[in-house]
């Protein structure tokens, strides 16, 4: 059993404040939610289990039981998960406030210990001090947290997470902030709590405390598209697709890291809870991460042999050719923008090949083919640059002075011609490597200008940022007929 979950279950009965704050979905009647095979720690109840996606941010971080309350660490309501979430520069004072909150919600004193021991003996006829019966008393106060970085903002979700060596398929990594506080002060807090426990339980408490307070922080995990709801990935091909998210909101107006102080003023806390409500947002999936996912999908299904062919048709419209025909039934082609990018890039590269080499058939096995797939993923700059340089060198450039040049005297389609005119001023007959890079960049940036995109989608915005975008009507920056340039 998860220690944090058990502590919330038993301490919830202590008083009115605890009953409101420590209410977890995992301790209530089960309501079904989409099952998944993602393993990790539920941020709400801290147990290691199968996770489902959060309705607030679309990241897999909540178990199927806690999902019924729809809590997210990015909410603007003072529920327990939000009060345990700290942001960016965490100070010693912030950590002291967190420890105070733990002491308020999970007190360990003689009265509390006697009450729990008497209840256990009375109801279960248990006269021994077996740790599993007193799991709720054995939750030490630590500065153990799961951390995630979202576009420059780092979030720390504090809690007591068991079994830290278990499989972690989430973008959250364990971080120990004890050095930001004071080891001796934290030791003193826990030794004081431990002194009220029977000797056998003291030993177990000490083992748990030191194992969770002296560990070395993990390296940051890189968030990627697989950490988000599969529903999003399945609909990315639709240019009009919107992500629907819900956020728990209230009139809480404290500094982000000071939310945990609200439990010290019970009256104010319940006044804020009375203003709690749910807000719904439709946001765009446009971000660097999902754009890269789409561009990689294109690179996997194109036919590199097209660049050495003589077909009159565009790359996505070639039929009955063993080497050049693509499967037009694939869902990736439902996005006309990806189709346009594919047609233009391959048309431009083919024109360069025809202008500078004698290759004349799509069945040819050429060295240049190995560079074609990587020229679509502009988000991976190093690999993209290497592929463009590889293509350029395969065209046997001529050196004049300190520069290398290639020819362009083969026809290109109208879209490619417009790109060249827009960026170079005319359709040139001689190109440098920089000209080629500029042209290829423009063919992608016209639709997906990743230079100005967030890495993660707007589902990871805080509520105040979502409200700002909503006020300017920019939560959904999509239009099926307008490119980034337009």
UniProtKB/Swiss-Prot annotation:
Classification via Pfam families? Rota_NS53
GO MF terms, alphabetically ordered: metal ion binding; RNA binding
Chain segments carrying region RNA-binding: 1-81
Question: GO terms for biological process?
Answer: symbiont-mediated suppression of host cytoplasmic pattern recognition receptor signaling pathway via inhibition of IRF3 activity; symbiont-mediated suppression of host cytoplasmic pattern recognition receptor signaling pathway via inhibition of IRF7 activity; symbiont-mediated suppression of host NF-kappaB cascade
Q: Does the keyword Metal-binding apply?
A: yes
Q: What segment(s) does the record annotate as region Interaction with host IRF3?
A: 317-486
Which parts of the sequence are annotated with region: Zinc-binding domain? 42-79
Q: Where's the motif pLxIS motif?
A: 480-483
Place the motif IKBKB-like degron (ILD) motif on the sequence: 479-483
Main location class: host cell
What residues form the membrane-spanning segments?
A: none
GO CC annotation terms, alphabetical: host cell cytoplasm; host cytoskeleton
Give the location in the cell.
Host cytoplasm, Host cytoskeleton
Q: What are the boundaries of the region Important for cytoskeleton localization?
A: 82-176
Summarize what the UniProt record says about post-translational modification: The C-terminal region is phosphorylated by host CKII/CSNK2A1. Phosphorylation of the DSGXS motif is essential for host NF-kappa-B inhibition.
Query: Which UniProt keyword terms apply here?
Result: Host cytoplasm, Host cytoskeleton, Host-virus interaction, Inhibition of host innate immune response by virus, Inhibition of host IRF3 by virus, Inhibition of host IRF7 by virus, Inhibition of host NF-kappa-B by virus, Inhibition of host RLR pathway by virus, Interferon antiviral system evasion, Metal-binding, Phosphoprotein, RNA-binding, Viral immunoevasion
Assembly with partners or alone: Interacts (via C-terminus) with host IRF3; this interaction leads to IRF3 degradation. Interacts with host IRF7; this interaction leads to IRF7 degradation. Interacts with host CUL1 and CUL3. Interacts with host BTRC.
Summarizing the function annotation, the protein's role is: Plays a role in the inhibition of host innate immunity by inducing the degradation of key host factors required to activate interferon production such as IRF3, IRF5 or IRF7. Associates with components of cullin RING ligases (CRLs) including CUL1 or CUL3, which are essential multisubunit ubiquitination complexes, to modulate their activities. Recognizes the host NF-kappa-B regulator BTRC through the presence of a DSGXS motif in the C-terminal substrate recognition domain.
User: What is written about domains in the entry's comments?
Assistant: The integrity of the zinc-binding domain in NSP1 is important for degradation of host IRF3. The pLxIS motif targets host IRF3 for degradation; however phosphorylation of NSP1 pLxIS motif is not required for its activity.
Q: Which HAMAP family does its entry note?
A: ROTA_NSP1 (MF_04088)
Q: Which family does it belong to?
A: Belongs to the rotavirus NSP1 family.
**What name appears for this protein in its UniProt entry?**
Non-structural protein 1
UniProt source species:
Rotavirus A (strain RVA/Pig/United States/Gottfried/1983/G4P2B[6]) (RV-A)
Q: What is the lineage of its organism?
A: Viruses, Riboviria, Orthornavirae, Duplornaviricota, Resentoviricetes
